[in-house]
């Protein structure tokens, strides 16, 4: 996962892309402007362009990206965060890390104990099968 600044940069780049796409699509689909001095022939048979739908779509995308940017900015550490607050936060994270490490060590220990039990049971099963097979072979041999 990227850090907050990289996420913020990606969101700003995405917002810029959305603005460029919105302007391009609206320019392409928008109705032609009429100039009083210039006579232009407009094809009346052209189908109506869904510019309103595009406008709503791009407005929603831009608004959502702007909200994402606000959330990312709010998640950045503030200037009010003093060294003491940062040290306390770091200490808390270290405690959580030690607790997680202890829990992991306990789980690994229990896993090793289960592995030993399983290996012992498998060895007993293999030994029993060998005894059964050797007993079956000795009984099946004809007496000569």
Curated annotation (Swiss-Prot):
Primary location recorded for the protein, binned into one broad class: nucleus
Keyword Lyase listed: no
Localisation per UniProt entry: Nucleus
Source species, domain of life: Eukaryota
A Pfam match: Med21
Membership in a protein family: Belongs to the Mediator complex subunit 21 family.
Subunit structure: Component of the Mediator complex, which is composed of MED1, MED4, MED6, MED7, MED8, MED9, MED10, MED11, MED12, MED13, MED13L, MED14, MED15, MED16, MED17, MED18, MED19, MED20, MED21, MED22, MED23, MED24, MED25, MED26, MED27, MED29, MED30, MED31, CCNC, CDK8 and CDC2L6/CDK11. The MED12, MED13, CCNC and CDK8 subunits form a distinct module termed the CDK8 module. Mediator containing the CDK8 module is less active than Mediator lacking this module in supporting transcriptional activation.
Protein name, as recorded: Mediator of RNA polymerase II transcription subunit 21
Source species of the chain: Bos taurus (Bovine)
Taxon lineage: Eukaryota, Metazoa, Chordata, Craniata, Vertebrata
């Amino acid at each position: 996962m990227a850090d907050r600044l990289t996420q913020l940069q990606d969101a700003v780049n995405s917002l810029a892309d959305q603005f460029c796409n919105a302007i391009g699509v609206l320019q392409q689909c928008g109705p032609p402007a009429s100039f009083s001095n210039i006579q232009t022939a407009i094809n009346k048979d052209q189908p109506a362009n869904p510019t309103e739908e595009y406008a709503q779509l791009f407005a929603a995308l831009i608004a959502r990206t702007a909200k994402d940017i606000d959330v990312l900015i709010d998640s950045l550490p503030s200037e009010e965060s003093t060294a003491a607050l940062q040290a306390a936060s770091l200490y808390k994270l270290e405690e959580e890390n030690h607790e997680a490490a202890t829990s992991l060590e306990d789980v690994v220990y229990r896993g090793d104990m289960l592995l030993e039990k399983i290996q012992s049971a498998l060895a007993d099963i293999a030994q029993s099968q060998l005894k059964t097979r050797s007993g079956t072979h000795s009984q099946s041999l004809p007496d000569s």
